[in-house]
Amino acid sequence: IVRNGEVTELRKDIVDLFDDRTVTFLIGSSVSFDGLLAEKGYPAAFGPTIQLTALPCTPVGPFAGNMAVTIRSFAPDLVDDVWAFTSHFPTCHGAPIGKNNAAELGIEDLNVNMNGQQFAVPDGTDRLYWACGITPRIVAEQAKLPFMISYTPGHAMITDIPTESLYQPNN
C-alpha cells in the first residue's frame, strides 16, 4: 500500500480497500514467458532481477520517472532466438530493449539490482534487458498519489490466462 509516494503497508489481502471509486490497471510481466523460454530450450543462465535505468519515460501530467528493466542473461548462441521468440509477446513486454548495453541505458553498477542487492551474471553470457512492469509503480510513487495499491516484484497478479494464448505470430 503506497500513500503519498511511500510504501506504508504490505498486504496479501486488499479486498477491504476496494470501493466504487477504485480503478485498477493490470500490467503485463516478462516473467510470464520465462516458463515458455525454458520449454523452448532457451533457459536463462541468470535472472530475472530488476535494475533502474537513467532513461526517462515520457511524462504525462504528474507522472514522470525513469524506466526500470528486467535483466536476464543467456548463452550467446541463444540470444537471437530469445529475442525473436519474446517479440511475439507484446503484452508481456515483448522483445528486449537492449543487449549488453547497460551504459547506454544509464545503469551504473552492472551487478546491483534496484534494491541494492549484489548479483552475479555468469561469465560468457549476454545480458538482455526488457522493459519492466515495476516502472508504472515507480512513476506513480514519484507522483506522490495519496493512495495506491501496487504489487511487489515476485508477487504479481496471477490469472487463468494461458501464457501460450498471449503469443502473437505477426509481431
Stretches found by the model and what they are:
Residues A120-N171:
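C-terminal functional extensions of proteins
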Residues I1-F119, I149-S150, H155:
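Conserved mixed alpha/beta catalytic, RNA-binding, or beta-rich assembly cores of soluble enzyme
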